[in-house]
Regions:
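Conserved beta-strand elements of the Class I
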Residues: 5-7, 150
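Active-site PLP attachment segment
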Residues: 13
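Conserved phosphate-binding catalytic cores of ATP/NTP-utilizing and phosphoryl-transfer enzymes
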Residues: 1-4, 17
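Glycine/Thr-rich phosphate-binding loops that ligate phosphate moieties of nucleotide
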Residues: 17-241
Length: 241
C-alpha cells in the first residue's frame, strides 16, 4: 500500500517507500519501479546510504571500542544517555536530505567524563538518526503517511537500535523472522512469473511472521535527536553557504 516503507540494513542501509502508481521525481531520493503487472506500475522512493553496520564495524575494527557488533547494544544500555556525545557518521559525506559531499565524520561533545560506552552509544544512535531524519523529511516534503514500517537485515538483532527508530518516528516496527527479505521477495516474484503462483493473493500463503517493536514515551532520545540535527545544521549544512 502507499506509504508502506522497508528499511534494509547491512553495511549500509536502503529505504524504500511505496508512493503508489504515480511516478515522482525527487531530488532527495531515487525513484524506482517497485512492482509491475499487466494492470499497473507501483513506484517507490529510495534512499541509499553507505554506512549503517559499517559504522559499528568502524567502532570495532578502527577504534577497538567493541569486540563484536553485539557489544554496541550491551554498552549502549549501560548508560542512561549519550552524555552529550554525538557522532556525525559522514565517512563518505552526508547523504539525503543534507547532501554535503565533502563532509567528514566527527565526534562532538567529548569531555573528561566521556567513556567508551558513550562513544559507542553515540555511534549506534547516529545510524538510527540518519534513517529517521530522511524519513521525517520525506513525510513532510511529500506528505507521506508511513502506515507500515518494516526493518530487516543484519542490524535487526540490535533491539536497542530498533527501539530508537520506533520511539523517534512514533510508529510500530515490523521485524520479519527472516533476516533477508529482499532476496525472499525476489524469490516469490520469480515464482509468480513462472506461474507457480497464479496471482498476488497467492503470495499471502508465503507471508513471513513478524515480531513487533512498540514505541514508548522517551523524551530524552527525541531531545538527543534534536541536538544531533542542530550539530549537522550548524557545522555541515550552513558551512556550505
Amino acid at each position: 500500500d502507499k506509504g508502506d516503507t522497508k528499511i534494509t540494513t547491512g553495511t549500509g542501509f536502503n529505504i524504500q517507500t511505496n508512493i503508489g502508481n504515480e511516478m515522482i521525481i525527487d531530488e532527495n531520493s531515487l525513484t524506482s519501479l517497485a512492482f509491475t503487472s499487466d494492470k499497473q506500475n507501483i513506484y517507490a522512493l529510495e534512499c541509499l546510504n553507505s554506512f549503517a553496520g559499517g559504522t559499528i564495524s568502524w567502532l570495532k575494527n578502527n577504534l577497538k571500542l567493541i569486540d563484536k557488533p553485539e557489544d554496541s547494544e550491551v554498552l549502549s544500555k549501560k548508560e542512561k544517555d549519550n552524555n552529550g556525545v554525538y557522532l556525525i557518521p559522514a565517512f563518505s559525506g552526508l547523504g539525503p536530505p543534507f547532501w554535503v559531499s565533502d563532509a567528514r565524520a566527527a565526534f562532538f561533545g567529548i569531555s573528561a567524563s566521556t567513556n567508551t560506552n558513550h562513544l559507542v552509544r553515540a555511534g549506534l544512535e547516529s545510524v538510527a538518526y540518519q534513517m529517521v531524519v530522511y524519513l521525517e523529511f520525506m513525510k513532510k516534503s511529500r506528505n507521506l503517511n508511513l502506515k507500515n514500517l518494516s526493518v530487516d537485515g543484519g542490524m535487526v538483532k540490535n533491539k536497542f537500535f530498533l527501539q530508537l527508530i520506533s520511539n523517534l518516528l512514533e510508529i510500530e516496527l515490523n521485524i520479519p523472522e527472516m533476516e533477508d527479505m529482499s532476496s525472499y521477495g525476489a524469490l516469490l516474484f520469480g515464482m509468480q512469473y513462472y506461474h507457480n503462483l497464479k496471482n498476488t493473493t497467492d503470495l499471502n500463503d508465503f507471508k513471513v511472521k513478524n515480531s513487533k517493536i512498540i514505541p514508548n514515551n522517551d523524551d530524552s532520545i527525541r531531545n538527543s535527536f534534536s541536538s544531533w540535527k542542530e550539530i549537522v545544521d550548524k557545522h555541515f549544512v550552513k558551512n556550505q553557504d
